[in-house]
Amino acid sequence: MAHILNGCSFYKGLYIARHDRLVDLVSQELRQVQDRTTHMYKHSTVKLNWFDHNCTDNNILCNIPNTPDIVFINQARKSLTIFEIGCAFDLYLDTCFTSKFMKYQPLVECITALGYNCQLIILVFGSLGHVHKVVLRGLQMGGLQKADAKRVQKFCSVSATIGSLHIWKRRCVVYP
């Protein structure tokens, strides 16, 4: 089942659609609680010209993963928050969290070196509906009140499950 819901290259487009739906849900909710001076980028490569800096090394962001799911940047406060969202088979939530953390930690270090306060928030949802233990706290760190964070967490969990149901139904059509 893990292979069908998360690992088969035949269903990659459906995995991406499920993931992008989660990104859209989270970004929509978080955007509402950010102040007007905060810019949001979705599925965008982090660029050096986003920052006020004195760095002369134009290749500082090269050779590291630098396309997170959601980025909020506030120039006035010199702060940046990166949201990375994952949808893994429920047994591998911790593995997915660690993988995402290790992937984007070099980007956080580069942005911090530019003089910005950078936060990395990882939200991992299970393809069968489980939610990683830090998702609620991550949504709150993004600015949501606890009740709203719980609502978004549950909505994303249900959305991931529905996405998995679509994948399973497609599998049953292809291999009856």
Task: List each model region and its residues.
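Short Cys/His-based metal-binding microdomains
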Residues: 1-30, 80
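Metal-dependent nuclease catalytic cores in nucleic-acid-processing enzymes
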Residues: 30, 101-116
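Domain-level recognition of nuclease-like catalytic cores that cleave nucleotide substrates
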Residues: 118-176
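Short helix-terminating capping/connector loops at secondary-structure junctions
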Residues: 38-41, 113-119
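Active-site metal-binding core of divalent-cation-utilizing nuclease and nuclease-like domains
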Residues: 32-84
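Short beta-strand-loop-alpha-helix junction that forms the active-site gateway
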Residues: 67, 79-99, 125-127
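Alpha-helical interaction elements in eukaryotic regulators
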Residues: 4, 18-22, 26, 97-103, ...
